[in-house]
Amino acid sequence: MSDLDRLASRAAIQDLYSDKLIAVDKRQEGRLASIWWDDAEWTIEGIGTYKGPEGALDLANNVLWPMFHECIHYGTNLRLEFVSADKVNGIGDVLLLGNLVEGNQSILIAAVFTDEYERRDGVWKFSKRNACTNYFTPLAGIHFAPPGIHFAPSGA
């Protein structure tokens, strides 16, 4: 594997990592479905395992999106290990802030993603993701609000 191929692969995988977070936050079905191989597995410990693009959409539409009014993921500490020219293992941390539908309150979730990425016919996608939640903490009495909700404009 050339240095250039390694750098291009790393950039493509970093985009996949971000695309998953953006797709869930912005509720973008097309983006979410496009990042998984048909035989991929996405496991969220305590929830279940979902297979392929259809499984990812099932998880989003029937579990994740109904749970939140809105959410935002912050992905960090992504570390990639090249197993071969076409297979990479990754680990990264995620912090999610969101407003739950149930109880209409805010929540903080910290999780670790352990991933496997594969390149097939020149394209990188997820072949496996395992999400392990470290913290699932409702923030009692707090509801995240957009700017302008709590403060009147100057001179009002």
UniProtKB/Swiss-Prot annotation:
Effect of pH on activity: Optimum pH is 7.5.
Induction and repression of expression: Constitutively expressed.
GO cellular component labels: periplasmic space
Outcome following mutation: residue 20 to Q: 3% of wild-type activity
Gene3D superfamilies: 3.10.450.50
Organism field: Sphingobium indicum (strain DSM 16413 / CCM 7287 / MTCC 6362 / UT26 / NBRC 101211 / UT26S)
Enzyme Commission numbers on file: 4.5.1.-
GO process terms (BP): response to toxic substance
Subunit and partners: Homotrimer.
Protein family according to the UniProt entry: Belongs to the HCH dehydrochlorinase family.
Active site: 25, 73
GO molecular function, one term: lyase activity
Function, in words: Catalyzes the conversion of the important environmental pollutant gamma-hexachlorocyclohexane (gamma-HCH or lindane) to 1,3,4,6-tetrachloro-1,4-cyclohexadiene (1,4-TCDN) via gamma-pentachlorocyclohexene (gamma-PCCH), proceeding by two successive 1,2-anti conformationally dependent dehydrochlorinations. Also shows activity with alpha- and delta-HCH, giving alpha- and delta-PCCH respectively, but not with the beta isomer. Is involved in the degradation pathway that allows S.japonicum UT26 to grow on gamma-HCH as the sole source of carbon and energy.
Gene from which the chain derives: linA
Metabolic or biological pathway, per its Swiss-Prot or TrEMBL entry: Xenobiotic degradation; gamma-hexachlorocyclohexane degradation
Domain of life: Bacteria
Main location: periplasm
Reactions listed under catalytic activity: gamma-hexachlorocyclohexane = (3R,4S,5S,6R)-pentachlorocyclohexene + chloride + H(+); (3R,4S,5S,6R)-pentachlorocyclohexene = (3R,6R)-1,3,4,6-tetrachlorocyclohexa-1,4-diene + chloride + H(+)
Location in or out of the cell: Periplasm
Other noteworthy facts: Is not N-terminally processed during export, so it may be secreted into the periplasmic space via a hitherto unknown mechanism.
Protein name from the UniProt record: Gamma-hexachlorocyclohexane dehydrochlorinase
Keywords from the named record: Detoxification, Lyase, Periplasm
